[in-house]
């Protein structure tokens, strides 16, 4: 076998490989001889089929199989001989297998970069810490009580905040009724903001049996694009008004929610608030860590990974409102530059974390995958069981989660063992403002 290196620069390795035809012919002959002992052909006893007959029937397929095996063997030999750290499948080009002298082809191999892990102990980050107070917990109890109110008492008085109103409504845009603009026996709690902004407020002061003209403007980000930003008028019939019976928040109330006492329910809400904030804090800290890492990384990345990441980003833009808003009114050149920069950042950080996980011998445990699946499920409120069933019945989908799961494990290991974390305490209100500001600041990743 002859090997001529054509290119060995950066992350590209190209070589021309040739194998004497005599070696190919020898392999073909051996394969055909083996087949004479195995194949069954009418008119011949088992194991007594002449080679010429076998060659006539199977010669082409045997030759193709031998050539494919030779190519794979040769490529693996080159990879081992040159100690190549490859990514993806090698590309075979300029294949010549009809020559009377040799099998020849060019192999193009993309390499992984050599990654030097930076000194992570020099990195420092703030670690927000939420201090849950009694006011936060009482707010959650009040919200729960509001959701479980009994609207049994019919009212003839004027509508006020907190009342449950049953309405019929027809919506008009430029005096023409529009599709999906009709409501029948629709129940709405005044002040719940369940309807278009401004709708509920205009019902206040009316009574059962009255007709109200409600004028609103659909939000620019309204889910029905054909209605977004448009002015509309609704003719509303007030069919019934009910007031809520007062809800007493006590031990009996708590028992309705699988708690033995009100104190136990308070403890549950304290932990829930802490857990919800912890997930948001971890996301922001991860992004802030990536911002720091981005400035430390300058290695080249495989072109195939870069293109793959750009395609993922582009295909997800229409589902990402923040991304879509950021690119609005940008030129094609600016959009391309944005995707190039973001894709490069993601690939570099992904490769670094994979190398870091390898250096620390981090292994995925079942709990690591469960956490990632739980995160996925939380993105689909009310459909959690469907998400769990999907991953339970799709092993290939589970495989797709292993990369993100290992990345998360590496990030948590870095937080716990490498970088300096400075704890900073926040109230719930302060933390919400901080997280909102950070979400606006950080680079999308």
UniProtKB/Swiss-Prot annotation:
Q: Which PROSITE patterns does this chain map to?
A: FKBP_PPIASE
Q: Which UniProt keywords apply?
A: Cell cycle, Cell division, Chaperone, Cytoplasm, Isomerase, Rotamase
Q: Name one GO cellular component term.
A: cytoplasm
Catalysed reaction equations from the record: [protein]-peptidylproline (omega=180) = [protein]-peptidylproline (omega=0)
Q: Which GO terms describe its biological process?
A: 'de novo' cotranslational protein folding; cell division; chaperone-mediated protein folding; protein transport; protein unfolding
- Enzyme group, top EC level? isomerase
| One Pfam family per UniProt | FKBP_C
Q: Report if keyword Acetylation is assigned.
A: no
- Please list the residue ranges annotated as the PPIase FKBP-type domain: 162-247
- Which Gene3D superfamilies does the record match to this protein? 3.10.50.40, Trigger factor ribosome-binding domain (3.30.70.1050), Trigger factor, C-terminal domain (1.10.3120.10)
UniProt GO molecular function: peptidyl-prolyl cis-trans isomerase activity; protein folding chaperone; ribosome binding
Give the location in the cell. Cytoplasm
InterPro entries noted in UniProt: PPIase_dom_sf, PPIase_FKBP_dom, Trig_fac, Trigger_fac_C, Trigger_fac_C_sf, Trigger_fac_ribosome-bd_bac, Trigger_fac_ribosome-bd_sf, Trigger_fact/SurA_dom_sf
Enzyme Commission designation: 5.2.1.8
Query: Which NCBIfam families does the UniProt record give?
Result: tig
Q: Which PANTHER family match?
A: TRIGGER FACTOR CHAPERONE AND PEPTIDYL-PROLYL CIS/TRANS ISOMERASE (PTHR30560), TRIGGER FACTOR-LIKE PROTEIN TIG, CHLOROPLASTIC (PTHR30560:SF3)
**Domains: what does the record tell us?**
Consists of 3 domains; the N-terminus binds the ribosome, the middle domain has PPIase activity, while the C-terminus has intrinsic chaperone activity on its own.
Q: What family does the entry list? A: Belongs to the FKBP-type PPIase family. Tig subfamily.
What does the UniProt function comment say about this protein? Involved in protein export. Acts as a chaperone by maintaining the newly synthesized protein in an open conformation. Functions as a peptidyl-prolyl cis-trans isomerase.
Spell out the protein name for this chain: Trigger factor
Give the lineage.
Bacteria, Pseudomonadati, Pseudomonadota, Alphaproteobacteria, Rickettsiales
